[in-house]
Design a protein with these regions (language model features):
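Conserved Rossmann-fold NAD(P)-dependent oxidoreductase catalytic core, especially the SDR/UDP-sugar
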Residues: 87, 99-141
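A conserved pocket-lining segment of Rossmann-fold NAD(P)-dependent short-chain dehydrogenase/reductase
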Residues: 181-208, 215
Length: 315
């Protein structure tokens, strides 16, 4: 299958690209910066800009040749303060990219067969007590609005293109993301829960997320919205306890919420608040997780990558 990949040069893409190559797909990767990725065609463009999708552009030509598209594009959510300018970037990098992509798909003489588009569990808002499935309504905060607009943009694809939306939880990998930031601190023995420790963490091992995307591209039974999370969300306190145990290090030194708010402003809510997002539809499909429990996920991501089985599949 010839695939066009957007937003696949970061944390998820580092595993997704070789997994898709191993499955025999031919890849064109879009990046805003020049970079070397073995075995793929690379297009240097900013997909959030309408000009990048102009008739005759390399991006437009690649789309017209693609049988499938994976769109994970979006600036990181919780890495700096949510100033008005940064919020604009968070929205534009996701929503404008998706709108331009969908408009190009609509006008393409040969639309792709499938679009796998990212969203996030932030769609549901936050709660200390409620749990959320794909049927739960949207929340009422900034991230809910962002995810809602993102999904609406993706939902405008023509009926001829099968749409799969993945509401992604916290992606666990040792080389980046939330866990990648926590590991150096925990390894020195100074780790601990962030904020109250009672906030929920809906997580997924990166390998399982990549397997889900790989499977959804070719399995015609995938359609609609899926919570891309493991079925065992945990409170932050439990996450840190298990991480400390996996590293044989203590997890006793909490990071006070006010400190994080000082650093990230409103963006601290991503870390200090959470939700229990349950993968009801994936479980109904019988999706096979390589790491269904947190201890299995930590064992997987903390051991050498070569030991991890990455082939997609279900029971």
């Amino acid at each position: 299958m010839r695939l066009l990949l957007l937003g696949c040069t970061g944390l998820v893409g580092r595993e997704l690209v070789p997994m898709l190559q191993g499955a025999g797909h031919k890849l064109t990767v879009v990046s805003r910066r020049k970079r070397a990725i073995a075995g793929v065609d690379l297009i240097e463009a900013d997909p959030a800009l309408a000009a990048s999708w102009a008739d005759g552009s390399s991006l437009r030509r690649a789309l017209e040749q693609a049988e499938g598209v994976v769109n994970l594009a979006g600036e990181p959510i919780a890495e700096q303060r949510w100033t008005p300018a940064h919020l604009k970037t968070l929205f534009s990098s996701r929503i404008d990219t998706t709108r331009h992509l969908v408009a190009a798909i609509k006008s393409s003489p040969a639309p792709p067969q499938v679009l796998v588009n990212a969203s996030a569990v932030g769609f549901y808002g936050t709660s200390a007590t409620a749990s959320f499935t794909e049927d739960s309504p949207a929340g009422a905060d900034v991230l809910s609005d962002l995810c809602g607009q993102w999904e609406v943009a993706a939902g405008q694809v023509p009926d001829s293109t099968r749409l799969v939306i993945t509401r992604i939880g916290i992606v666990l990998a040792a080389d980046g993301g939330a866990l990648g930031k926590m590991l150096p601190i925990f390894r020195t023995g100074f780790g601990g829960p962030i904020g109250s420790g009672q906030q929920w963490m809906s997580w997924i091992a990166r390998t399982d997320l990549c397997r889900l995307i790989t499977e959804a591209l070719t399995d015609l039974s995938y359609a609609g919205i899926y919570n891309a999370t493991a079925p065992t969300p945990v409170p932050m306190q439990e996450f840190c306890t298990q991480l400390g145990r996996a590293l044989n290090r203590p997890s006793l030194l909490p990071v006070p919420g006010p400190v994080l708010k000082l650093l990230l402003g409103d963006g601290a809510a991503v870390v200090l608040e959470g939700q229990q997002a349950l993968p009801q539809r994936l479980q109904q499909k019988g999706f096979h997780y390589t790491a269904k429990s947190l201890d299995a996920a930590l064992e997987q991501v903390l051991r050498p990558a070569a030991a991890v089985a990455t082939s997609p599949g279900r029971h």
